[in-house]
Amino acid sequence: MNGLMIAAPSSGSGKTTVTLGLMRALRRRGLSIAPGKAGPDYIDPAFHTAASGKPCFNYDPWAMRPELLLANAAAAAEDGSVLIMEAMMGLFDGAADGTGAPADLAAALGLAVILVVDCARLSHSVAALVGGYARHRDDVRVAGVILNRVGSDRHEGMLRDALAGIAMPVFGVLRQDAALKLPERHLGLVQAGEHGSLEAFIDHAAMRVASGCDLEAVLAAATPLTVGERAGTLKPLGQRTAVARDVAFAFCYEHLLSGWRGQGAEVTFFSPLADEAPDPRADAVYLPGGYPELHAEQLSNASNFRAAMHKAAGGGARVFGECGGYMVLGEGLVAADGGRYEMLGLLPLVTSFAERKRHLGYRRVTPVDDVFFRGPMTAHEFHYATIVSEGAAEPLFTVRDAAGLDLGRAGLRRRNVAGSFMHLIDFSE
């Protein structure tokens, strides 16, 4: 299978919209698109799945072992004719030490790069910008550009003339279009499941990409993908794991679910927002992250969900929550307006969005004991909640940031119930 990376000089350049339009346009031509997302982001993959019709794997060169990156590519190759990978941030932006950039991923997987350039405030300077990106690393090939937010025919002509001077192919030109802007909130884009006209948006993006880009040239730029054998992932929480899944609990990595199934575990889903109970046969329940703060009142009134979670925990099932799921396992959640909502009360924890503080970055976590996990792991943390109070319970992890700074202990465990703000990704070497 061949692959491409859709990257940009910076965030906000329009690469998500271009990626969605490209996936849908190529899918309409009969191609089987394998979607991918660089980095730890949960939100973009749901849009990719909507555009491509296929599950989207994350590829994170900082947090994932090289063998897992190659294994994810192999899994994608089994069910796709071309991999379309969306980068994160700028092409060469990574963790604090510079590692883990999309460029590292392009080099590791052999992906040609198409650079999406926001040209709203550029003309001839585009050549210096693109030329610098093309020459920055010998092991990363910028195959061409898509010029986004171009204002007029005259503007397009200046841009094309400038890029002709450095022999950089222009695969497409997209004019400024207010209808091609996705709504955002504090953790990124508004989720795909909450976008009231998502299909219409993707169809419009596909129409603009198909009419403004040379799709044959885009496909011709794709390069053979470097793949590997299957790699081990984090162990499943249980033999039969019930996973919360709705707009309040949507942040769950596809490589983990796929890895759990590959290890023989059964995965079922339920919706706390619909007041559903986890599978009563489950020996583990997983509450992933999401936006419980936006649905706190509804969750506090979900009596069937609450009773079933207490029954599962009381019956010995391993219950684990990450970030938003961790907050729901606590006793209460204080919303941004100061109103408090009662949560499950399975952990002695009260969290608040009334006192906001951003927590963001890669983490290396080591379990304090082996009740839930063994060995060091990589993780990512991104939230605005603060801990108002914390009662007596065992700590779950010791934590270091990407630079190795000791962040102390984090998370809580009370018998067979545990959680933390960290989104676990892979084993740490």
Curated annotation (Swiss-Prot):
Active-site residues, record numbering mapped to chain: 323
Substrates-to-products reaction catalysed: hydrogenobyrinate + 2 L-glutamine + 2 ATP + 2 H2O = hydrogenobyrinate a,c-diamide + 2 L-glutamate + 2 ADP + 2 phosphate + 2 H(+)
SUPFAM superfamilies: Class I glutamine amidotransferase-like, P-loop containing nucleoside triphosphate hydrolases
Broad class of enzyme this protein falls into: ligase
UniProt keywords, alphabetically: ATP-binding, Cobalamin biosynthesis, Glutamine amidotransferase, Ligase, Magnesium, Nucleotide-binding
Record GO terms (molecular function): ATP binding; cobyrinic acid a,c-diamide synthase activity; hydrogenobyrinic acid a,c-diamide synthase (glutamine-hydrolysing) activity
Pathway assigned in UniProt: Cofactor biosynthesis; adenosylcobalamin biosynthesis; cob(II)yrinate a,c-diamide from precorrin-2 (aerobic route): step 9/10
Residues forming coiled coils: none
Domain GATase cobBQ-type: 240-429
Gene (name only): cobB
Annotated protein name in UniProt: Hydrogenobyrinate a,c-diamide synthase
Site (Increases nucleophilicity of active site Cys): 423
Function: Catalyzes the ATP-dependent amidation of the two carboxylate groups at positions a and c of hydrogenobyrinate, using either L-glutamine or ammonia as the nitrogen source.
